[in-house]
């Protein structure tokens, strides 16, 4: 047997590993909402509320990372003016009235309040399915109460997927960190206080409620059998096809800077079998902070041809992340082929595209399209 070329744990560069973990977590955080409370500013007195601030949930499956820094540890390291109040436990839906009122009072007296909310690990086990999409009631109640007394209320979410957020319109800002690994604490601190720009984008739609999801009518099924009857209408395709309002759409993510799109164009207005078409767009950082924009390209079938199983309104086909300094602009280029406008036909056992008109949609998210370009295709089978 050949000797392993992998370094032993003792030989690994832990400093480099940790730096990479922090950077990955920074780029994974998604700023879902921001009415101005973020970024926090030096000198502000900020109440940190919620046990996840001190005991971060950074992964699933009983992880054992060699070092995990909490948001509180990172704030102390950077000399932030914070006061920590537990408010609610991380592992139970349990309300302690005295602790609840102490958290509300601290939030009201502060310049801003950051509530670290999320699901306990027992709610997201691989061996069991979630029965609902709610946060623990003790968390929802405290968020609502704090938002009523503190206009600069920020919620940081630690979950592995979407949750219902009934308080979303009442808080100033929402930052979703998901389960961002051992670099979670430092990354959360950097994003909250503006040392880094949020550049993550949602990999899924966040619905308003469980009843809006495509699986609601079929789950949990009959015994050990669950039918997946949504067909091609998976994820954002379901919500777009029904023109349903959602909490936050697929691909969404805000920034502390701004981006302007201009000059979107195709190098040809017709795509032929075996050919390619190039889509271009120029993106400019119009703000005062370095950031990274994720440019997304969707394809919509506008041929009107009948489609067995249903036609999805649009489908993501390309995306590119572009780092930009303030005032910098860069051209983003995508190359498209007939595969990108095609669907698989079980009857023909082939990828097919109806002849006619397609729309190339370029934008910031699935529901923030900045340019629509027309493209013709002339063949029915690849």
Functional labels for PLM-detected ranges:
Residues 1-382:
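C-terminal non-catalytic regions of proteins with extracellular/luminal or membrane-system context
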